[in-house]
Amino acid sequence: MKLDSSISAIVTGGASGLGGATVRALRAKGVKVAIFDMNEKTGVPFAAETGAVYCNVNVTNDASVDAGFAQARAANGQERILVNCAGTGNAFKTAGRNKETGEIKSFPIDQFDRIIQINLVGTFRCIAKSAAGMLTLDVLPDGDRGAIVNTASVAAEDGQIGQAAYSASKGGVIGMTLPIARDLSTESIRVNTILPGLFNTPLLAGAPENVKAALAATVLNPK
């Protein structure tokens, strides 16, 4: 697929971090881009700067995602590219003891569910709805109808302390990639998943320095 102004793309989590870098890269090629992100304070000026369309979308909510696709398609036409970067994390041990008070706590199940809903279910929700739209398009001369890229993490295969929910969510993204790719292969839609390592994004920036150092120490290459 040649990246130019004839192509429309949607990037979830596109207001910052890896998603933001993806938006910049696509716009540099002339691709029409819509950003799905809940952070309006960051998303609106970033979209204005890059020439993208900002859509305030919560990937855990069906109606919000439907409205986002409708807004993006009204502005840019049916997307041929979907890049899923929307995601979040937290840090809770499965169970642990407070060294000072002796209090014992377990992983808050609502926080576990929140990570799964955003990182895994939200990713699938956007894939399914985007793929349905892509099916209305003709196949390009090079044989492509559409392309979907998902973001997992090295944490899916090498999870660290306190990362049970995050690792599970990203492992789920990896696990569903091949079945989805097979589902859509006969329709000329490619599906791939990347496993980024550790790099400086707003998600990581909010972590304490000792946590960032501990995570960085586990990344083999590149540092």
Task: Give the residues covered by each predicted segment.
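Alpha-helical segment proximal to the catalytic Tyr-Lys
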Residues: 132, 181-183
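Conserved glycine-rich Rossmann-like NAD(P)H-binding loop of the short-chain dehydrogenase/reductase
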Residues: 29-45
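Active-site helix of classical SDR
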Residues: 127, 169, 177
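The beta1-alpha1 cofactor-binding region of Rossmann-like NAD(H)/NADP(H)-dependent oxidoreductases
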Residues: 40-41, 57-70, 109
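Canonical Rossmann dinucleotide-binding motif of NAD(H)/NADP(H)-dependent dehydrogenases/reductases
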Residues: 2-34, 180
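Residue(s) in the substrate-gating loop at a strand-loop-helix junction
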Residues: 153
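Substrate-binding pocket helix/loop in short-chain dehydrogenase/reductase
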Residues: 93-104, 108-113, 214-215
